[in-house]
Amino acid sequence: MVADFVAQTGCDLLAVAVGNVHGLDIEPKVDLPLLEQISKISPVPLVMHGGSGIPFDIIQKAREFNLLKVNYGSDLRKAFVSTFGQAYEANHNACSVIELSIEAVENVSEKAAELVTIINS
């Protein structure tokens, strides 16, 4: 089924659902044996959506099974939004949206760099 799907769609990457979940409200339970089985029959590298909340040792193990890309949207959104929350808590009256937006983008960039470093280690 995997090889047929790739052949029929011509996709370059295949996003898989192996216990990964979107958001941070549900604990992911990644099925590494299933990921390994899929990797053996997939002619293209694999992608995992819902990477936020998955322990890095699981991600590193998953990379052994042709996992090329992991999406961390919730972690990056959390880094962005927490900037505003922390600033508001620190000083309710002195919140410059422009300055906070710049700081939020910097925080997202730092978080993204951290995730890339961990994944590539």
Q: How should these model regions be labeled?
A:
Residues 47, 69-72:
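Short hydrophobic alpha-helical runs that function as membrane-insertion/retention elements
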Residues 1-42, 56-65, 72, 78, ...:
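Alpha/beta enzyme core
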